[in-house]
């Protein structure tokens, strides 16, 4: 039975490590006068191809339901960004808007430094033409949409080139204007203090003699560059790719490989489209009451696009109409994302053990609210988990202590039966039955802790709250590996001590394998997040104390009975 236990431990170690690696592979300005509104909407069709227009920009513009007034254009025309960007800064966002099309082409997060040693350099989420391509685009396409013009995307004007949320100001509105053929357009961005979501609204003021019709589109465009927010240590890559909401699947991942295979089209009511990376998410959220056409595609420049097209907005002559969507660009904060749209909080992906990980994060968050330090919070969480499993662990350690106590009898059986494994195995089972020992009892703590261990791994890896979270001394970031490998070495030492408390396998080969386990696990844990290794160190330390106490108690009782 000892060989089964050895095989189980080795198998769990290998499965854990390989499972982590496999997961990683699947993932690496002034307002217009208010007028009477006379507008209606109809559902959009899902386009079969991307449509653009001649001129500067329109390979980026998706086609809506084709009409005689919709200008088809070459697909190969790349977007050309304006050098004269409009800069907007709030307390949590620092972004730039391109007047050509009104796209958000740059975005930084001032509260999230790119590196811990450079707190003055904010993490850059969007970039266009720098190190990579990642931006949020939106516009009006369809019959009369200005983004479907043969002349290219509209060039907006603004009253200022720089906007900043002032002290004491809670809301800031940035209006971009464009007029053509008697129709006045306002592309309005509304920012609020402390929020990473902004509302983008199109106001269509139709002063022409003809009805106006168009569709709002919003999309995220990204190249295939690596994730700048992800750690690079072995075993810590996370999912980089798109995702969307459907009624049947509230969180549907769409990887770059999926987009390479062909367009994905869905018709959904409400929903959202998003691009995920480590710790951060960007999402377009349309009107939750509207039926929207969601689509993914790959443009001729090799960029990946996921977006939606809203129902047709119709505006009568002399009337005004509005259509809007919300853009979120910021950290994966579950509470915030859940309020924005159903299912969006699932972008904090805890894997197949999410039902264990979610309560762990909830408890960890509440402990942190009291202690104010994630490292100490992990220690307290470990103590609570250990207390929860105390009865089960105690039963297991009692079984192991009894096996340790009968070790001399097992050695005697080995001498009696020699190399006759069948008789040896039969004699061992009779001895275990006589002594009321469960030979597999020592495996229970490992089996029970593995789901908790894996769940905590994803909590530490996926939760933005852990990003750059310090503990003490040299541990300045619990979400990445220990820079000096001190915690993994301590963990290996605790495993060695635990091993000394366990019964020695009667087979010499098994004994050698067991002696190698602390070294093997130490190697595995070298690149694991420091917070996870901290959990394992504390758990092992508590286990040693519990097991040593039970072992001494049973050995004393055994000696007393023998006297």
UniProtKB/Swiss-Prot annotation:
Which membrane topology term applies here?
Multi-pass membrane protein
On the tree of life, the source organism's domain of life is Bacteria
Q: Which GO terms describe its molecular function?
A: membrane insertase activity
Q: Where is this region: Disordered?
A: 43-62
GO:BP terms for this protein?
Answer: protein insertion into membrane; protein transport
**Keywords tagged on the record:** Cell inner membrane, Cell membrane, Chaperone, Membrane, Protein transport, Transmembrane, Transmembrane helix, Transport
The record's principal subcellular location, in a coarse class, is membrane
Q: Subunit composition? A: Interacts with the Sec translocase complex via SecD. Specifically interacts with transmembrane segments of nascent integral membrane proteins during membrane integration.
Which PANTHER family does the entry mention?
CYTOCHROME C OXIDASE ASSEMBLY PROTEIN COX18, MITOCHONDRIAL (PTHR12428:SF65), OXA1 (PTHR12428)
Functional summary from the UniProt entry: Required for the insertion and/or proper folding and/or complex formation of integral membrane proteins into the membrane. Involved in integration of membrane proteins that insert both dependently and independently of the Sec translocase complex, as well as at least some lipoproteins. Aids folding of multispanning membrane proteins.
* UniProt record similarity statement: Belongs to the OXA1/ALB3/YidC family. Type 1 subfamily.
**What name has this protein been given in UniProt?**
Membrane protein insertase YidC
Q: Encoded by which gene?
A: yidC
């Amino acid at each position: 039975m000892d060989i089964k236990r050895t095989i189980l431990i080795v198998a769990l170690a290998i499965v854990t490590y390989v499972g982590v690696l496999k997961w990683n592979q699947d993932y690496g300005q002034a307002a217009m006068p208010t007028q009477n509104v006379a507008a209606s909407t109809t559902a959009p069709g899902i386009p079969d191809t991307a449509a653009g227009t001649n001129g500067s920009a329109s390979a980026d513009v998706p086609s809506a339901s084709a009409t005689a007034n919709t200008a088809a254009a070459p697909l190969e025309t790349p977007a050309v960004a304006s050098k004269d960007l409009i800069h907007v800064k709030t307390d949590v966002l620092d972004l730039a808007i391109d007047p050509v099309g009104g796209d958000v082409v740059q975005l930084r997060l001032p509260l999230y430094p790119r590196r811990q040693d450079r707190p003055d350099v904010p993490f850059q989420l969007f970039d266009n033409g720098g190190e990579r391509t990642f931006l949020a685009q939106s516009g009006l396409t369809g019959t009369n949409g200005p983004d479907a013009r043969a002349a290219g995307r509209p060039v907006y004007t603004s009253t200022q080139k720089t906007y900043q949320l002032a002290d004491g100001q809670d809301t800031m509105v940035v209006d971009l204007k464009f007029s053509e053929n008697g129709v006045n357009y306002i592309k309005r961005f509304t920012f609020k203090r402390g929020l990473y979501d902004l509302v983008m609204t199109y106001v269509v003021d139709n002063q022409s003699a003809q009805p106006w019709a168009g569709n709002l589109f919003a999309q995220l465009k990204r190249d295939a560059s690596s994730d700048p927010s992800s750690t690079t240590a072995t075993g810590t890559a996370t999912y980089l790719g798109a995702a969307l909401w459907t009624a049947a699947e509230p969180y549907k991942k769409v990887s770059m490989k999926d987009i390479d295979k062909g367009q994905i089209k869905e018709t959904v009511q409400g929903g959202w489209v998003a691009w995920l990376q480590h710790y951060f998410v960007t999402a377009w959220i349309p009107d939750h009451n509207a039926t929207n056409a969601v689509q993914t595609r790959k443009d001729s420049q090799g960029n990946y696009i996921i977006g939606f097209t809203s129902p047709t907005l119709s505006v009568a002559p002399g009337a005004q109409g509005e259509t809007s969507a919300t853009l979120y660009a910021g950290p994966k904060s579950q509470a915030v994302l859940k309020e924005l749209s159903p299912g969006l909080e699932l972008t904090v992906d805890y894997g197949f053990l999410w039902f264990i990980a979610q309560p762990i994060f909830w408890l960890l968050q509440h402990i942190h609210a009291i202690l104010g330090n994630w490292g100490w919070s992990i220690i307290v969480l470990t103590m609570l988990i250990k207390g929860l499993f105390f009865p089960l662990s105690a039963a297991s350690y009692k079984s192991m202590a009894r096996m340790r106590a009968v070790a001399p009898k097992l050695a005697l059986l080995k001498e009696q039966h020699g190399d006759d494994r069948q008789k040896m195995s039969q004699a061992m089972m009779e001895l275990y039955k006589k002594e009321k020992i469960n030979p597999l009892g020592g495996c229970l703590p490992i089996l029970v802790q593995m789901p908790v261990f894996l769940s905590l791994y994803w909590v530490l890896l996926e939760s933005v709250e852990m990003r750059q979270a310090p503990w003490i001394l040299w541990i300045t970031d619990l979400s990445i590996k220990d820079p000096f490998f001190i915690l993994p070495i301590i963990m290996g030492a605790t495993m060695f001590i635990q091993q000394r408390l366990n019964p020695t396998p009667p087979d010499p080969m098994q004994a050698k394998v067991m002696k190698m386990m602390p070294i093997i696990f130490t190697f595995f844990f070298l690149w694991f997040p420091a917070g996870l290794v901290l959990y394992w160190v504390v758990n092992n330390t508590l286990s040693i104390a519990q097991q040593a106490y039970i072992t001494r108690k049973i050995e004393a009782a055994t000696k007393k009975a023998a006297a």
